[in-house]
Every structure is written in structure tokens, then in C-alpha cells.
Amino acid sequence: MACGATLKRTLDFDPLLSPASPKRRRCAPLSAPTSAAATPSSAAAATAASFSAAAASPQKYLRMEPSPFGDVSSRLTTEQILYNIKQEYKRMQKRRHLETSFQQTDPCCTSDAQPHAFLLSGPASPGTPSGTSSPLKKEQPLFTLRQVGMICERLLKEREEKVREEYEEILNTKLAEQYDAFVKFTHDQIMRRYGEQPASYVS
């Protein structure tokens, strides 16, 4: 009983029997904040400053630059096309004797090649018979459709390989620049956070 009497609250602190309001009184604002109360605000300010610096640093290192692929030549010039055609024509002249010998042995190939040559050379004029056509019409075409297709295929393949090499070179350069910027940004963040602290074996 004695222990119970000493532990029991007095009537002044009982919310049901006290004449004052049972609601708790709000904390009154202090005129001058203490050092303990100022610690969370300073920590929050430091955290916000670190986040803002972290958000601004990538923009500083990774600036928006124009695309490097705009400088790549997108079209072949007339001189390049003419040079490539001449080179391909020289290659095909070396193989022409093989094709002629094959056409002489196989008559079906000569009959297939005649329509292609006719399409390239064009029909004869309606006023002149086929036997007495002009000297220009009697000339054989330089290339058949099959040869033109081979030339175009080779030119496209060479152009594709060149564009692929340029693309790989530019891509590797940009990846190296981004990696260097990332390493520098990470180093700056580490030095900003742990640079002022003394080095220890624990860290």
C-alpha cells in the first residue's frame, strides 16, 4: 500500500480531475535556437548542398555537344563513283575471257545474254532495218545487266565497310570520353566527401 501510494500521481496531473484542459500545450517557439536544435538543420542543409552539387556536376562534365556523325560524308562524289567504276571495269576485263569462253561452250548462255545486251543498247530506229542500222547501234554495250549489278554490289559493300569503320572509331572515342568524365566526377565526389577527414586504417 505504501509503495502504491507513493507511485500514484497527484490530482494536479490527472487530466480527468484537473480543472485545466486535458489537451497538451504546444511547444512555444524559442527565441534563440540552441546548438542541439541547430544540428539537424545544418545536417539537412549539408545534405541538400551535396545533392545539388552531385546533380550539377554531371552536367558540367557531360555537356550537350553536337553529333559527331554530322561531319561524316554521307554521299559519294562523282569522281569517286567514276574511279570505282573504272577499277571495277579493269577487274572485269581480266575475267572477260573466262566468260566468253564459257559462252562459246554453252549456247544457252549466249541466248540469255542477248536480251540483256538489247536492253542496254536499245532497239533500232523504226526507219532503218536491223541489218542496216547505224554504226552506233552496232556497237556492243560495255556492260551487261549482270555486270552492272556486280559493280553496284561491290561499290555498296565498299561504302558500307568504310561507314562502319568511321562509326566504330567515333563511337569508341565518345565512349572513352564518357568514361574519363565519369572517373573524374567520381574522384571529385570522393575528395569532396572524405578529403577533409584524416586518413585512417579503418577507412
Swiss-Prot record:
GO molecular function: protein-macromolecule adaptor activity; transcription coregulator activity
Purpose: Molecular adapter that acts as a bridge between a variety of multiprotein complexes, and which is involved in embryonic development, immunity, myogenesis and brain development. Plays a key role in nuclear protein degradation by promoting import of proteasomes into the nucleus: directly binds to fully assembled 20S proteasomes at one end and to nuclear import receptor IPO9 at the other end, bridging them together and mediating the import of pre-assembled proteasome complexes through the nuclear pore.
Motif annotated as SYVS motif, chain positions: 200-203
Assembly behavior: Homodimer. Interacts with IPO9; the interaction is direct. Associates with 20S and 26S proteasomes. Interacts with SMARCD1; promoting SWI/SNF complex recruitment. Interacts with NFKBIZ. Interacts with YWHAB.
InterPro entries: Akirin
Subcellular location: Nucleus; Cytoplasm; Membrane
Organism name: Bos taurus (Bovine)
Biased composition (Low complexity): 119-135
Maturation and modification: Polyubiquitinated. Polyubiquitination is dependent of UBR5 that extends pre-ubiquitinated AKIRIN2.
Modified residues (Phosphoserine): S18, S21, S57
Full protein name: Akirin-2
Similarity annotation: Belongs to the akirin family.
Cross-referenced PANTHER family: AKIRIN-2 (PTHR13293:SF8), AKIRIN-RELATED (PTHR13293)
Gene Ontology biological process terms in this record: adaptive immune response; cerebral cortex development; defense response to bacterium; innate immune response; nuclear protein quality control by the ubiquitin-proteasome system; positive regulation of adaptive immune response; positive regulation of innate immune response; positive regulation of interleukin-6 production
UniProt motif (Nuclear localization signal) ranges: 22-27
Gene Ontology cellular component list: chromatin; cytoplasm; membrane; nucleus; transcription repressor complex
Stretches for region Disordered: 115-137
